């Protein structure tokens, strides 16, 4: 895939990632990858004032969320099915920037992220490599959070253990201005586009998961399936629809 490559600093590790995911320089691309001293960032060449995007599992936001964790306040704990010493294996079939996958792993679950877009996969891999080396979280992140680069619709063909839980957070259109995400995330959505195969992805997930499929939706959106939703957990802005496997 072609994208504008800007080298602010030479980094051998990141250069290997560019080669691994076959990312080539395109002078005319409106999106760019910034190679920093120790991180890979996606940025908008048409708006240099817009904050670049990178995967950072050691961010202040993640640190705060983990440090202030309370079972009743963490919705991913409530929907995951964690009980006592039971920590389900989770397959995040719509990894994105890995935010929710990281929280599942922090909670004690072994998590596999699947991402098909090569640029997003490169950002995730960069974030994982840096996270694995972190003194505070690296020791458990290495054993709990991993990435598979593939199409989630082909998950039945991937030689992986059958997960207890499959988590879906598909892209959805926004119908009014108040529901728009931050500008940097709007830019990220331009890169990966909307998921028009979300319903099919749910069907495939229900054939693979052992215990449950969790679908994250905006509060105003219709369920992905016409089948019965077995359980619903709501927050201020989102709804988590839980389905049983076939």
From Swiss-Prot:
CDD domains assigned to the protein according to its UniProt record, in alphabetical order: AdoMet_MTases (cd02440)
Reaction(s) catalysed by this chain's protein: guanosine(1516) in 16S rRNA + S-adenosyl-L-methionine = N(2)-methylguanosine(1516) in 16S rRNA + S-adenosyl-L-homocysteine + H(+)
Compartment(s) of residence: Cytoplasm
Molecular-function GO terms, alphabetical: rRNA (guanine-N2-)-methyltransferase activity
Keywords: Cytoplasm, Methyltransferase, rRNA processing, S-adenosyl-L-methionine, Transferase
Entry keyword annotation includes Cytoplasm: yes
EC number(s) given by UniProt: 2.1.1.242
CC per GO annotation: cytoplasm
Keyword Chaperone assigned: no
Gene3D superfamilies: Vaccinia Virus protein VP39
Annotated positions binding S-adenosyl-L-methionine: 115-116, 169
Family membership noted in the UniProt record: Belongs to the methyltransferase superfamily. RsmJ family.
HAMAP family for the chain: 16SrRNA_methyltr_J (MF_01523)
Entry function: Specifically methylates the guanosine in position 1516 of 16S rRNA.
Protein name: Ribosomal RNA small subunit methyltransferase J
Organism: Buchnera aphidicola subsp. Acyrthosiphon pisum (strain Tuc7)
């Amino acid at each position: 895939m072609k994208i504008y490559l800007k080298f602010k600093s030479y980094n051998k590790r990141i250069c290997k990632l560019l080669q691994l995911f076959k990312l080539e320089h395109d002078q005319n691309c409106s999106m760019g990858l910034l190679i920093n001293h120790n991180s890979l960032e996606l940025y908008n060449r048409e708006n240099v004032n817009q904050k670049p995007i990178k995967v950072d599992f050691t961010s202040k936001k993640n640190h705060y969320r983990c440090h202030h964790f309370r079972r009743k306040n963490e919705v991913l704990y409530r929907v995951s099915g964690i009980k006592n010493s039971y920590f389900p294996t989770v397959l995040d079939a719509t990894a994105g920037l890995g935010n929710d996958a990281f929280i599942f792993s922090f909670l004690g679950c072994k998590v596999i992220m699947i991402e098909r877009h090569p640029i997003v996969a490169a950002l995730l891999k960069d974030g994982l490599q840096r996270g694995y080396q972190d003194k505070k979280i690296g020791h458990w992140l290495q054993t709990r959070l991993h990435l598979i680069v593939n199409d989630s619709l082909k998950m039945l063909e991937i030689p992986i253990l059958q997960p207890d839980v499959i988590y879906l957070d598909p892209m959805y259109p926004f119908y009014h201005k108040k529901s728009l995400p931050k500008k940097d995330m709007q830019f990220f959505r331009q890169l990966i586009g909307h998921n028009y195969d979300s319903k099919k992805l749910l069907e495939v997930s229900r054939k693979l998961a052992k215990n449950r499929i969790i679908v994250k939706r905006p509060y105003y959106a219709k369920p992905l399936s016409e089948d019965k939703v077995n359980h619903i957990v709501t927050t201020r802005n989102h709804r988590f629809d839980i389905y049983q496997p076939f």
